[in-house]
Every structure is written in structure tokens, then in C-alpha cells.
């Protein structure tokens, strides 16, 4: 499927141009992180086979692993039934979280 067809399936209007993206370990199924993508970051992700996101705080694109070396290699991309959320299954190199934890979801609330 080409980029134009993929872009048509995604509803970027609901999230003001951003789409929440869940990152999951391809092999273990562990949820690693949640980040946001825009059209450009999704295109770069598909083109490079590594994850790219939109930083809401810095207001810029960032390639996961570019600084740390903890790249995420894309195995598959899925869209939810409403077209307003993505699930990307990756091969994760090293920890996904900036704290050094494997997953950003390491704190139990209940």
C-alpha cells in the first residue's frame, strides 16, 4: 500500500493533525510507549522503517533512537476501527523509555 492510500485511511482531523500511536514489542507483545505522529512522521516511519514521532513539547519531529541508539525497527503498522489511532509493532533495540526502562509503562497504579 502506498503512502497516499495509507494517509487517506487515517483521520488526522480529530487530533488536530496528530494521531496517538502505541508502540508494542513485536516479539513479546509488551506495550513499550505511546507517542504522537503527524502525516510527516508517519511518512518518514514508512520510508525509513524506523519510528519517527512529533514532539508536542518541542514541536519538532524526532527519530526514536537517533540520540540513544535505541532504535525501533518497524515490523507492522495497524490502524484502529475509527482510523484515529495507530499500533506499531517494532523490534526494539535497548530500552524504549528515556528513563532506561524497557517500557514507559513501568509504574503500577492499581
Curated annotation (Swiss-Prot):
Chain positions recorded as Mg(2+) binding sites: 80, 82, 84
Free-text comment on the cofactor: Binds 1 Mg(2+) ion per subunit. Binds 1 zinc ion per subunit.
Disulfide bonds: none
Biological process, per Gene Ontology: L-histidine biosynthetic process
Organism domain of life: Bacteria
Catalytic activity: 1-(5-phospho-beta-D-ribosyl)-5'-AMP + H2O = 1-(5-phospho-beta-D-ribosyl)-5-[(5-phospho-beta-D-ribosylamino)methylideneamino]imidazole-4-carboxamide
Binding site for Zn(2+): 81, 97, 104
Designated name of the protein: Phosphoribosyl-AMP cyclohydrolase
Protein species of origin: Clostridium botulinum (strain Okra / Type B1)
Name of the gene this protein is made from: hisI
Amino acid at each position: 500500500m502506498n503512502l497516499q492510500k495509507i494517509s487517506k485511511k487515517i483521520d488526522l482531523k480529530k487530533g488536530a493533525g496528530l494521531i496517538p500511536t502505541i508502540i508494542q514489542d513485536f516479539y513479546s507483545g509488551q506495550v513499550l510507549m505511546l507517542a504522537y505522529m503527524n502525516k510527516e512522521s508517519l511518512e518518514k516511519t514508512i520510508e525509513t522503517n524506523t519510528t519517527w514521532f512529533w514532539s508536542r513539547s518541542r514541536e519538532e519531529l524526532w527519530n526514536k533512537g537517533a540520540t540513544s541508539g535505541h532504535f525501533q525497527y518497524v515490523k507492522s503498522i495497524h490502524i484502529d476501527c475509527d482510523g484515529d489511532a495507530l499500533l506499531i509493532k517494532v523490534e526494539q533495540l535497548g530500552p524504549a523509555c528515556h528513563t532506561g526502562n524497557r517500557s514507559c509503562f513501568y509504574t503500577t497504579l492499581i
